[in-house]
Amino acid sequence: MAQLWGGRFTKETDQLVYNFNASIGFDQKFYRQDIQGSMAHVKMLARQGILTEEEKDKILEGLQGILDDVENHRLEITSEYEDIHSFVEANLIERIGDAGKKLHTGRSRNDQVALDMKLYIRDEIREMDGLLLELLKTLQKIMEENLHTYMPGFTHLQKAQPITLAHHMGAYFEMFRRDRGRLYDIYRRMNFCPLGSGALAGTTYPLDREYTAELLAFEAATRNSMDSVSDRDYLIELLSAMSTIMMHLSRFCEEIIIWNTNEYQFVEIDDAYSTGSSIMPQKKNPDIAELVRGKTGRVYGALMSMLTTMKGLPLAYNKDMQEDKELTFDAIDTVKGCLALFTGMLSTMRFQKDRMEESAKNGFTNATDAADYLVGKGVPFRDAHGIVGRLVLYCLEKKIALDDMTLEEYQKISPVFGEDIYEAISMKNCVEKRNTIGAPGADAMRRVLEENRRYLEEEKF
């Protein structure tokens, strides 16, 4: 058992207790960040005269050697160590001797792990941001190619009004754009360095916390040492933001699953992103979309676990907080995997454009435009609404669409109808005359696409 404490104990730790308490099985995930933080700490200690330049150089060389050996698989992180901190320190002392014993001067594992987690989360946020950016670029491409691909828009899963595929994809563009914004907000709010806070009450050593923060690219040092070691707000915020990302992916997947059915046939998922059945040879299943939808609950669960863990903890650090890592790591890996797979599936998906437009025509999605036509002829909207309701009922009885009615049939229900009704309710006209901000008309969508292009070129981090 390699651990960083034990002087005041008269007995060896029970093996079951040691195993239960140890975190090396999961906190080894941020070995790189642990070494990065230690390097900055050592440079600061030397700058403040707490370490000599010779000691600093020796420790830095030893830390770099550990990092290189781990990354090149020459050194294995094993369960004989309690945590990643003890692994690094024990190996450092073994390599460079007594100088390595000075690494932890002016530092506690409480502020050390708080730093490691923040460094790790910063890296992961940047990675997730890159994955969201690729998804947004994929959506932008689909939008640009489908300004005139008409389809039904839905409310209550029933056909409502005609829109375009570009407009539908644009709704998801907005969702994932907001997701990027949330990640950026979390990054900005958490970007303060906790190192130097000690166990909870700072330290008597003359540490330069601002210098350490600068070395590690933080905005500044944290302002309260107790909060620094017990703050997990940024993890709760991240898990909430990731839950929202997964909710958006899940909604999108649900639509793809529906659109992929024989009853809709709006899309065909590429073979590379589909699976079959062990008994039914005809099956081509949307398993990726279903798994993304299913994994959403897993990320929600991590958020609820984190909230529950933190809800009753008095200041400052408590061992309960060790539970933050496994669930956060798992949620991050889940979200990144889902984003990458979903983007691949979406970019290879084939949209059945003719089927989409035919579905819009057969679902009375132009009924609102028929009512608007009557309003334009001077009929009060409430009366127009009732007239078109009778038109729809007539079409249902005859099993025809509004476009299929003769002018004589129209005029039997209302003499206000003229030959121009057919142009008024054409799919193209229904969509293209809607050009206010946020509407599906091509002119409105071109403005959106241009703004999207500028947005996609911006640097977030």
Predicted regions and their residues:
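Short, well-ordered beta-strand elements within core beta-sheets of diverse protein domains
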Residues: 41-51, 164-167, 236-244, 369-378
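Amphipathic alpha-helices that form helix-helix packing interfaces
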Residues: 38, 66, 128, 132-135, ...
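Short, contiguous, pocket-lining structural segments
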Residues: 127, 131, 157, 161-171, ...
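A helix-coil-helix interface module used to build multimeric assemblies
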Residues: 1-202, 207-214, 220, 275-276, ...
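Conserved hydrophobic residue
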Residues: 50-51, 75, 264-265, 380, ...
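Conserved helix-loop functional segments at active or binding sites
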Residues: 145, 182-185, 189, 218-222, ...
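Acidic, glycine-rich loop-and-beta core segments that form the ion-binding/anion-interacting portion
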Residues: 216-308
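Glycine-rich cofactor/substrate-binding loops
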Residues: 2-37, 98-99, 280-461
